[in-house]
Amino acid sequence: MTNDMTKGAITPLLIRFTIPLVLGNLFQLTYNAADSIIVGKFVGEEALAAVGTSNPLMTLAILFINGMCLGTGILVSTAFGAGDTRLVERQVSTTAIAGTVFSLAFSALCVILATPLLQLMQVPTDILPIAVNYLRIVFAGLIFTFFYNFLAATMRALGDSKSALYFLMISSVLNIGGDLFFVEVLNWGSNGCALSTVISEALCCVLCVLYIRWKVPILQLGRRWLVFDGSLLRKTVSYGWASAMQQATVQLGKIAVQAIVNTMGVSTMAAFTAASRIDDFAYTPQQNIGHAMTTLMAQNRGAGKHDRVKQGFLCGMRIEGVYGVLIAVVCFGGAPFIMKLFVTDPEVIHLGVRFLRTVSLFYLMPAFTNGIQGFFRGVGDLKVTLVSSTINMLFRAAAAAVFVLMWKLEIEALPYSYVVGWVVMLAYELPLLVRYLRSHEDEL
C-alpha cells in the first residue's frame, strides 16, 4: 500500500499521515516506559535508576540506526514522488545489504563498550552491574532494530504510515506482557525487561516482512534484494550519515545531561528517569509532525511541485503550534497523576512534578524547531538539521553543567538548560529559513 502525497488537500494529508506516526511512537514509548514502571514497582529504586541511566546509551544506538534509515527514506520519497520505481527498488536493496553488515558490526561494538561507556557517564558502582547487563542484552538485538526501522521508514517514504503502527501495537502488547512474565513471574529483574524488548522488536521485523510480501508490490523485489549499487550507497551514506549524526548528537546531549544528573543522588536520578519518559511522550509527536512534513515535501520536491512544498511547511507549522499549546496544558496540570504511574516514593514524585511543570511551560519552542527541521530535511538540506541539533545539545549540556555543578541548583536546572539549547537552536535556524524562502521565492 502506497500513498501519493503530491495530490490532494495538504492539511488533511499531513494529519492523516502524522496520526499513525504519533500512535506508533507512543506505543513504542509505552513499551519502553513499561520497563521503568514494572522495574520501579516490582524490582526497586536501584534497578529503576540502572535502567534510567542505561536508557540514553540504548537510545543513542537506536537513534543512530534510525537516523540512517530516515536518510534513506528521504531518498526513497523523492524517487517515488518522481515516479521512478526502478530507482526505489535499487535504493531499498542497496540499503538492506549495507545496513545488515553495518548493524551487526555496530551491535558487537556496543556490547563490548557497554561497561566503559557507563563508567564514563559516572554511573554509581552499586548499580553498574545491573546497567551493564541490561544494555548488553538490548545491544545484542540491534539487528532487529535496524530491520524494523528500515522497513518502517521505507513504507512511510511511500506514504504508508499506518502499517508499521499495527505491527508496533502488537509488539508493544507482547513486550508489556513479556516484562510482567520475566520480571514478576521468573524474577529476572531488569534483564527480563531487556530480553522482552528484543523479542518484541524481532517479532515486529517478521510481521513487517510478511506484510510487505503480501501487500506492497513495489517492495517485493525477490532476487532484486541482492542488487547492490555502489553509487547509490555513497548518496545513501551521505544522507543517512547526516541524519544519523543529527539523531546521535541529540542523544549525546542527553547523555551529557544524564552524567550530570548522576551526581545529584539516586532519588533525583529516579525522578529524572520517570519525568524524562513522560517528557518523551510529550515531545515525540512534535518530531512526528516534522517527519510527516519531510515525507510530503520530499515527494513533492521529486515531482517538481514546489508550491506544495511551501504550503506543506506552513500547514505543518500551524499543526505544531496547536499541539505545543495543548500538550503544555496537559503536562502542567496532570504532572502529579502521571508521575504516580511510574513511582510510589513521595520524594521522587515531588521532584518529577517540579521537572515536568517547568519544562512544559516551554513546549512551543521544540514544536517550532521540529517543524523547521522537517522543512530542511524535506528539501534535502540535512546539514542545517545536523548543525542546529549539535548547537542545541552543546549549549544544553553546558548550561546544565553550570546550573548544577557550579550554581548547585536543583532539578529545575535541567529544564532550564533545555530552554537555553532551544533558544540558541532557533537563533541559528530562523535566519537560514528566511534566507532559503527568499532565495527560492520563484519556485515556492
Report the location of each language-model feature.
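N-terminal transmembrane alpha-helices
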Residues: 5-42, 56-71, 75, 100-107, ...
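Helix-terminus/linker motif at the lipid-water interface of multi-pass membrane proteins
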Residues: 26, 30-49, 118-125, 181-188, ...
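Transmembrane helical elements of multi-pass membrane transporters/channels
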Residues: 16-35, 137, 148, 171, ...
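Short alpha-helical transmembrane segments in multi-pass integral membrane proteins
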Residues: 1-18, 76-141, 185-241, 297-362, ...
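Short runs within selected transmembrane alpha-helices of multi-pass transporters and secretion channels
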Residues: 69, 137-156, 164-172, 193-208, ...
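Hydrophobic transmembrane alpha-helices of multi-pass small-molecule transporters
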Residues: 60-63, 175-179, 204-209, 281-284, ...
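Interfacial/gating helices of multi-pass transporter permease domains
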Residues: 39-59, 125-130, 190-193, 232-239, ...
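Small-residue-rich hydrophobic transmembrane alpha-helices
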Residues: 48-108, 145-164, 271-335, 366-380, ...
